[in-house]
Amino acid sequence: GARRLRVALLAERADASLGQHIERQLGAHWNARQVVLRSGSPLRLEGLERVDFARAGAILIPAADTMESSALDADTRTVKALMTMSAALEAAPPEEPPLVVAELQETRHGGILRALYPGPMEIVAGDEVISRLLAQIVRHPGLSHVYDEFLSDVSGSQIYVREGAQLA
């Protein structure tokens, strides 16, 4: 049968307040049995092993908060996390490396990530996404209101993605 989705979240400090924050953000979509919180650093193998990263279906690496660090620091942290994963996968290669979706602040660092990781990868470039959104807003007056509604942190203003087969 199909496996149920489980989310393992690795955070520097995973505690009850983090769980409560996630629960508030997800609202009715929250299911405590599907979310596992683990403390650790994605820059250290011990932390990655706590979430069994080598057997994951997908790994999401969000960029560090640029309010607390520079874009270069955020991208450096992403590169280091990927280097740690790559070294571990090289030492004990799984049948198929997990898909990695990594966020970068600067598009020019994408080549480094692709060279480091042996498996499938998608790169989300924060600067590029913002540039494209701004270009669309300039071309289509009024679109800023639509994006504001989609991207604001207000209940009911989220974008949910479904498999194509579910829409048929």
PLM regions: where:
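Cytosolic regulatory regions of ion transport systems
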Residues: G1-A168
